[in-house]
C-alpha cells in the first residue's frame, strides 16, 4: 500500500509507545502490525493513497468504527475520479454505523389519558322490584323496600373503562358511592364468586381496571345485565327469595334474576 505522505499533528496525537495506543506512523512498528479492518476495500484505499496500520493487540468494534470514520473523511477530502455512486455511500455508512433494533415498551396498566373518565351514579332494582342494600360492610342483599326504607338502597358509581367492547357490550366497573368498595369476581371453592372489594381511593377507579372488576353492561330493551368480564356467561344475579345475597350466576331467564332496571341518580 502507498504510504500516507505525512500525518498531521492531530493524527500524531494518537501515536505513542503505550501498548494500548493503536495508531502508529507509517514507518512505526511494522512487522507486527496488520489492519483490523481487513474486510475494507483495500484497492480503494490504495487508489486514494491511504495507509492504515494498527496493532493486532487490540481490535474491537470501537476501534473499527474510529478507523472507518478516518477512512471516510480522508476519502471525502480527495477529489473523486468518478461520480460517487449510491453503493459507495452505502459501503461507507455500513462501516461507520451499526443497525440496532428499537424496542418500544408500553405499559397498558400505566396508560393515562387527558380526557376525563366518564362515570354516572345510578340505582339498580331487579325485575321483581327488589332493591340492593348493603347489609354489612362487604355484602349486598336484594329485598323489597318501601317508605323511608327506600333510602337504604345503595347508589352505584358506574365508570366506563377499557375492555373488550362490542356493539351490545360496554365494559364498566361498579363501585358503591362514597365508599371504597367495588364489585369484583374471584374464584372461590372452584366457583366464580361475586364480592365487594376494598380499594385505594388514590388509585381507583382507573381507565385500565383489573379484569376481575370489569363487567360487560348489556342493554336488553328497558333492562340491563352485567356479565363478568373475568368469567364470561356469569352474571350479577339475585334470588327470587327475599333478602338473599346478590351473587354471580350462570343462569339467564330461569329462577335466578339477571335483569335489572337502572335509575340515574344526581
Curated annotation (Swiss-Prot):
GO terms for molecular function: cytokine activity; integrin binding; interleukin-1 receptor binding. Keywords: Cytokine, Cytoplasm, Inflammatory response, Lysosome, Mitogen, Pyrogen, Secreted. GO terms for cellular component: cytosol; extracellular space; lysosome. The record marks 169, 177, 179, 188, 202 as: Important for interaction with integrin. Gene3D superfamilies: 2.80.10.50. SUPFAM superfamilies: Cytokine (SSF50353). CDD domains: beta-trefoil_IL1B (cd23296). Residues 1-114 form a propeptide. One of its GO terms (biological process) is cytokine-mediated signaling pathway. It is found in: Cytoplasm, Cytosol; Secreted; Lysosome; Secreted, Extracellular exosome. It comes from the Eukaryota. Monomer. In its precursor form, weakly interacts with full-length MEFV; the mature cytokine does not interact at all. Interacts with integrins ITGAV:ITGBV and ITGA5:ITGB1; integrin-binding is required for IL1B signaling. Interacts with cargo receptor TMED10; the interaction is direct and is required for the secretion of IL1B mature form. Interacts with HSP90AB1; the interaction facilitates cargo translocation into the ERGIC. Interacts with HSP90B1; the interaction facilitates cargo translocation into the ERGIC. Belongs to the IL-1 family. IL1B production occurs in 2 steps, each being controlled by different stimuli. First, inflammatory signals, such as LPS, stimulate the synthesis and promote the accumulation of cytosolic stores of pro-IL1B (priming). Then additional signals are required for inflammasome assembly, leading to CASP1 activation, pro-IL1B processing and eventually secretion of the active cytokine. IL1B processing and secretion are temporarily associated. Potent pro-inflammatory cytokine. Initially discovered as the major endogenous pyrogen, induces prostaglandin synthesis, neutrophil influx and activation, T-cell activation and cytokine production, B-cell activation and antibody production, and fibroblast proliferation and collagen production. Promotes Th17 differentiation of T-cells. Synergizes with IL12/interleukin-12 to induce IFNG synthesis from T-helper 1 (Th1) cells. Plays a role in angiogenesis by inducing VEGF production synergistically with TNF and IL6. This is Interleukin-1 beta.
Amino acid at each position: 500500500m502507498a504510504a500516507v505522505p505525512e500525518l498531521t499533528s492531530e493524527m500524531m496525537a494518537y501515536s505513542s509507545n503505550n501498548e494500548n495506543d493503536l495508531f502508529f506512523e507509517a514507518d512505526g512498528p511494522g512487522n507486527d502490525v496488520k489492519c483490523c479492518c481487513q474486510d475494507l476495500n483495500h484497492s480503494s484505499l490504495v487508489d486514494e493513497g491511504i495507509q492504515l496500520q494498527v496493532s493486532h493487540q487490540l481490535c474491537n468494534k470501537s476501534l473499527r468504527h474510529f478507523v472507518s470514520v478516518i477512512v471516510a473523511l480522508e476519502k471525502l477530502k480527495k477529489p473523486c475520479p468518478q461520480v460517487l455512486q449510491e453503493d459507495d455511500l452505502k459501503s461507507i455508512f455500513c462501516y461507520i454505523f451499526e443497525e440496532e433494533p428499537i424496542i418500544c415498551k408500553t405499559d397498558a396498566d400505566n396508560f393515562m389519558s387527558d380526557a376525563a373518565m366518564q362515570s354516572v351514579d345510578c340505582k339498580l332494582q331487579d325485575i321483581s322490584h327488589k332493591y340492593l342494600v348493603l347489609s354489612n360492610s362487604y355484602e349486598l342483599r336484594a329485598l323489597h323496600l318501601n317508605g323511608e326504607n327506600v333510602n337504604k338502597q345503595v347508589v352505584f358509581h358506574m365508570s366506563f373503562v377499557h375492555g373488550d367492547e362490542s356493539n351490545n357490550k360496554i365494559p364498566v366497573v361498579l363501585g358503591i358511592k362514597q365508599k371504597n368498595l367495588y364489585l369484583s369476581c374471584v374464584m372461590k371453592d372452584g366457583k366464580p364468586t361475586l364480592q365487594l372489594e376494598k380499594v385505594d381511593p388514590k388509585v381507583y377507579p382507573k381507565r385500565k381496571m383489573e379484569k376481575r372488576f370489569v363487567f360487560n353492561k348489556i342493554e336488553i330493551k328497558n333492562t340491563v345485565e352485567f356479565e363478568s368480564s373475568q368469567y364470561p356467561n356469569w352474571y350479577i344475579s339475585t334470588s327470587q327469595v327475599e333478602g338473599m345475597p346478590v351473587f354471580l350466576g350462570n343462569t339467564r331467564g330461569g329462577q335466578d334474576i339477571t335483569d335489572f332496571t337502572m335509575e340515574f341518580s344526581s
